[in-house]
Amino acid sequence: MGIFRFISISLAAVSAANAGHILSMGHAKTIPNSYIVVMKDGTTKEDFTHHQSWVQSIHTHNVTRRGLLDNAGVRHKYGFGSMMGYAGLFDEDTIKDISDDPKVMFVEPDTTITIHGELTQNDVPSWGLARISSQRPGTEDYTYDSSAGEGITVYSVDTGVDIHHEDFEGRASWGTNMIEDGYDKDGNGHGTHTAGTMVGKTFGIAKKAKVVAVKVLDNNGSGPTSGIIAGINWCAQHASQNGGTDKAVINMSLGGGSSSALNRAAAQAVQKGMFLAVAAGNDNQDARTSSPASEDTVCTVGASAENDERSSFSNWGPAVDLFAPGSNIVSTRPGGGSQSMSGTSMASPHVAGLGAYIMALEGISGSAVCDRLKQLGTSSVTNPGPGTRTNILINNGDAKNGGKKPSQPSQPPKPSQPSKPQQPSEPQEPSEPQEPAPGQPAPAPAPVPQHPHTPFPNDDFNFDDFWKKYFGTDHWRKTFGRFWN
């Protein structure tokens, strides 16, 4: 073998070893000829631009030669955090060439993502709001701080939102449409419902937060993974230009088969400082089989019923971080009025809304919110499911602190029934003072909790300072926080 031939073969072997690969999507519903391409970490913008030009060139050549795939090519480009990539329609020859490029980390077939909720019935009383500000099920009042999420923006990555619904009070706006159907409205109802739970005046948790509609699912409640990633990318860029990613929340009441690309995109948004609440899924199976629920850095939410049991449909397992009300949840519907839906899709916006509420109240970053909600929650959920490491049901902290902070009573709406004012709590009898023993000083008074959301004896103790001092970075805490429960 000649030396030049040997060198040529060796270089080819090195190139193949460093090239990306096409991932298998298992049982996920793939979209024919549609692919997501993720570049390797460290790829420069210049390299990315050259790669895209090269892809367009070989794609045009292959399509012209074979006469395939009209209107194909790159459809979405991703560039936020350390993630660079794109998605589009490509023939087999082109995608093989792309996967062989050493700059490519992996190529993933595009799949269909769907909503995690279903319509059950109209006009039934909602209970979720009252449950998250009470220690016990069956209460009727929702107690919350008057800050109510003010200054926080929540991105509804869903089927769209009826931004003109009166319950949003002008705080809803249209962001973008990744479906490209020319229909910038919610033709399904799912997105409007989840948005109402997050920020609605009547049905919402963060009643003063803003919501931005990011349409990634069609009127049937489904859409491509590539469009979901593009939606996350858009949210991160929009937030960075409008108030900052540290004051932004993304709710994703959707999911599909396991996707490395989608999980990677979600992780990049968290790294940017955003809080991501994600539905665990409605298949009564391990949530690790679904994306983006299987991504470690997001806050994955299971659903609970009115008796605090895990909802029968809710996914479970180590990926689940928290539970929230998800059965028979009443919220807004397109065109006005309300409707009831069930699903982890309904649980996730409770967490997204509460995340916005806590971010506004305490000024914490998005990456710290999931752990904070674990601290505030109650260990209430029965039958959390096999391998689930938590039984925590979310709580806004009011019940734990006797409602001592500035708060507003409210009752979840009931059709044709006026709101019920909050009943004042019974005053407690003061305990009899104890006489000190002879020769002993009088005991000091017990410390009184001042901050309604701090589960420690007094406000002088700062958990974040303590953690950083003795255990290192927020990254360490975020990575291993899910094992505290």
UniProtKB/Swiss-Prot annotation:
Function: Secreted subtilisin-like serine protease with keratinolytic activity that contributes to pathogenicity.
GO BP terms, alphabetized: proteolysis
A Pfam match: Inhibitor_I9
Limits of the Peptidase S8 domain: 126-400
Main location: secreted
Chain intervals for the UniProt region annotation (Disordered): 377-462
CDD domains associated with the record: Peptidases_S8_PCSK9_ProteinaseK_like
InterPro entries: PCSK9_ProteinaseK-like (IPR034193), Peptidase_S8/S53_dom (IPR000209), Peptidase_S8/S53_dom_sf (IPR036852), Peptidase_S8_Ser-AS (IPR023828), Peptidase_S8_subtilisin-like (IPR050131), Peptidase_S8_subtilisin-rel (IPR015500), S8pro/Inhibitor_I9 (IPR010259), S8pro/Inhibitor_I9_sf (IPR037045)
Keywords attached to this entry: Glycoprotein, Hydrolase, Protease, Secreted, Serine protease, Signal, Virulence, Zymogen
Propeptide: 20-116
Sugar-modified residues: 251
Stored SUPFAM superfamilies: Protease propeptides/inhibitors (SSF54897), Subtilisin-like (SSF52743)
Name of this protein: Subtilisin-like protease 1
Upper taxonomic lineage: Eukaryota, Fungi, Dikarya, Ascomycota, Pezizomycotina
GO molecular function, one term: serine-type endopeptidase activity
Location in or out of the cell: Secreted
Gene Ontology CC entries for this record: extracellular region
E.C. number: 3.4.21.-
Keyword Transport: no
Enzyme class: hydrolase
Active site: 158, 190, 345
Biased amino acid composition, Low complexity: 419-428
Signal peptide positions on this chain: 1-19
Residues covered by the Inhibitor I9 domain: 34-116
Species of the source: Arthroderma otae (Microsporum canis)
